[in-house]
Curated annotation (Swiss-Prot):
Cross-link Glycyl lysine isopeptide (Lys-Gly) (interchain with G-Cter in ubiquitin), where in sequence: 396
Family matches, as SMART domains: HMG
Species in which this protein is naturally found: Mus musculus (Mouse)
Residue ranges annotated as motif 9aaTAD 3: 458-466
Protein name: Transcription factor SOX-9
Residues covered by region (Transactivation domain (TAM)): 224-307
Biased composition (Pro residues): 341-369
Quaternary state and interactors: Homodimer; homodimerization is required for activity. Interacts (via C-terminus) with ZNF219; forming a complex that binds to the COL2A1 promoter and activates COL2A1 expression. Interacts with DDRGK1. Interacts with EP300/p300. Interacts with beta-catenin (CTNNB1); inhibiting CTNNB1 activity by competing with the binding sites of TCF/LEF within CTNNB1.
Keyword line: Acetylation, Activator, Differentiation, DNA-binding, Isopeptide bond, Nucleus, Phosphoprotein, Transcription, Transcription regulation, Ubl conjugation
Region of interest (Dimerization (DIM)), ranges: 63-103
Biased composition (Low complexity): 30-41
Length: 507
């Protein structure tokens, strides 16, 4: 630090001039400069000194590189560097996309770069603790505060560098390197847009994703061969010929909700889906579904079995109608399960009102293997046509005996009045899973689900009744062709319009 002594007067003068300094960093830098400032570098590097020093000195800046920095700086640098053979240092080859062999030619510095480079070198030597980013900010602020006369030496130096650069590289053309990150971002965006398209069948699969334990439980109980792996991975929709047709429409229905990160689609609120649009495309290729596929949409574990208040809609995920707005189908099947079920177990939910008992002349013994088929159809029709009772269709939950399921499956072709989805040949697929359905009813302790599931028999998957019927009042029923008496429309409740069930027969 003995270098400092001869220049104490100079630093005192600088400190006087620094009283109006715009930035504390710069004032400290210039004040503590350990090297002679006669070269004019201090004058250029910090704004406030220009009134202390003669105006002619900044012109020295344009001279050779040696004069740019104070003597002590040059000596120290040469002392450090003299031991190195710089021919051994590899050239900093910055690859310029097209020609990988040529070193990258930098652009000529503009006036600010000339100023910033000289000032940064000086300040970095004096104050090594300064953070480079803060230094850059301060240099930029100072540059904006300089007036034209103060900037002139840097502007002239920059012009000289530009002319020199043009001589050295006559065919130079500025080619900024492209950022690779932009490409990655685009690729990510493309992936995201690919993910946002859902096939129409993902709608059905999305019901399975209501809750993780329910999806795994249902898939393992009902179709262990097919769906036991579904609980671990994301639901994969079955491929159908018309997958792309619906993708755009379903996109709109999703209301822009992105896919969950884990790969599970969010459960779809079918209040927003127009069944008019769905039925045309989805129903047309519904024939490619295996009937076991639908078992996973039976009620998940977490859902209540009984709607609490009249008119409240609970989406149970089953294809039965879960709203208490009564329909002929629900009325018929609720009373059907009431008629054939054993006495209710003690753990019946308290909020379910006791459903009125069916008339005694229509009682069928629970264990009777062959009930009169015509009487069953008559039971359904008469019960659903009693408006006073069907107004009270609070579903009663009770356990059903296995014979109830087998009876329903034997008679399922006779219940076509409620299953226009004409699938008598699907009924053989039910008996293998009769026991597991019964077990599941035990766990759930809610026979109301199975009043739809098994009571409806082959009509279980008909007509997409998982749409809340109170919000889809756009249909009128099609009379069925099976010879069973049709649903009487005159006695149906007034506040609910009849839905049209599209009649589907598998070829």
């Amino acid at each position: 630090m003995n270098l400092l002594d001869p220049f104490m007067k100079m630093t005192d003068e600088q400190e006087k001039g620094l009283s109006g300094a715009p930035s504390p960093t710069m004032s400290e830098d210039s004040a503590g400069s350990p090297c002679p400032s006669g070269s004019g570098s201090d004058t250029e590097n910090t704004r406030p000194q220009e009134n202390t020093f003669p105006k002619g000195e900044p012109d020295l800046k344009k001279e050779s590189e040696e004069d740019k920095f104070p003597v002590c700086i040059r000596e120290a640098v040469s002392q450090v560097l003299k031991g190195y053979d710089w021919t051994l240092v590899p050239m900093p080859v910055r690859v310029n996309g097209s020609s990988k062999n040529k070193p990258h030619v930098k652009r000529p510095m503009n006036a600010f770069m000339v100023w910033a480079q000289a000032a940064r070198r000086k300040l970095a030597d004096q104050y090594p603790h300064l953070h480079n980013a803060e230094l850059s900010k301060t240099l930029g602020k100072l540059w904006r505060l300089l007036n034209e006369s103060e900037k002139r030496p840097f502007v002239e130096e920059a012009e000289r560098l530009r002319v020199q650069h043009k001589k050295d590289h006559p065919d130079y053309k500025y080619q900024p390197r492209r950022r690779k990150s932009v490409k990655n971002g685009q690729a990510e965006a493309e992936e995201a847009t690919e993910q946002t398209h859902i096939s129409p069948n993902a709608i059905f699969k999305a019901l399975q994703a209501d809750s993780p334990h329910s999806s795994s439980g249902m898939s393992e109980v009902h179709s262990p061969g097919e769906h036991s792996g579904q609980s671990q991975g994301p639901p994969t929709p079955p491929t159908t010929p018309k997958t792309d047709v619906q993708a755009g429409k379903v996109d709109l229905k999703r209301e822009g909700r992105p896919l969950a990160e884990g790969g599970r689609q969010p459960p779809i609120d079918f209040r927003d889906v127009d069944i008019g649009e769905l039925s045309s495309d989805v129903i047309s290729n519904i024939e490619t579904f295996d009937v076991n596929e639908f078992d996973q949409y039976l009620p998940p574990n977490g859902h209540p079995g009984v709607p609490a208040t009249h008119g409240q809609v609970t989406y149970t995920g089953s294809y039965g109608i879960s709203s208490t707005a009564p329909t002929p189908a629900t009325a018929g099947h609720v009373w059907m399960s009431k008629q054939q079920a054993p006495p209710p177990p003690p753990q019946q939910p308290p909020q379910a009102p006791q459903a009125p008992q069916a008339p005694p002349q229509q009682q069928a013994p629970p264990q009777q293997p062959q009930a009169p088929q015509q009487q069953q159809a008559h039971t359904l029709t008469t019960l659903s046509s009693e408006p006073g009772q069907s107004q009270r269709t609070h579903i009663k939950t009770e356990q059903l005996s296995p014979s109830h399921y087998s009876e329903q499956q034997q008679h399922s072709p006779q219940q076509i009045s409620y299953s226009p989805f004409n699938l008598p040949h699907y009924s053989p697929s039910y008996p293998p899973i009769t026991r597991s359905q019964y077990d599941y009813a035990d766990h759930q302790n809610s026979g109301s689900y199975y009043s739809h599931a098994a009571g409806q028999g082959s009509g279980l998957y008909s007509t997409f009744t998982y749409m809340n019927p109170a919000q889809r009042p756009m249909y009128t029923p099609i009379a069925d062709t099976s010879g069973v008496p049709s649903i009487p429309q005159t006695h149906s409740p007034q506040h609910w319009e009849q839905p049209v069930y599209t009649q589907l027969t598998r070829p």
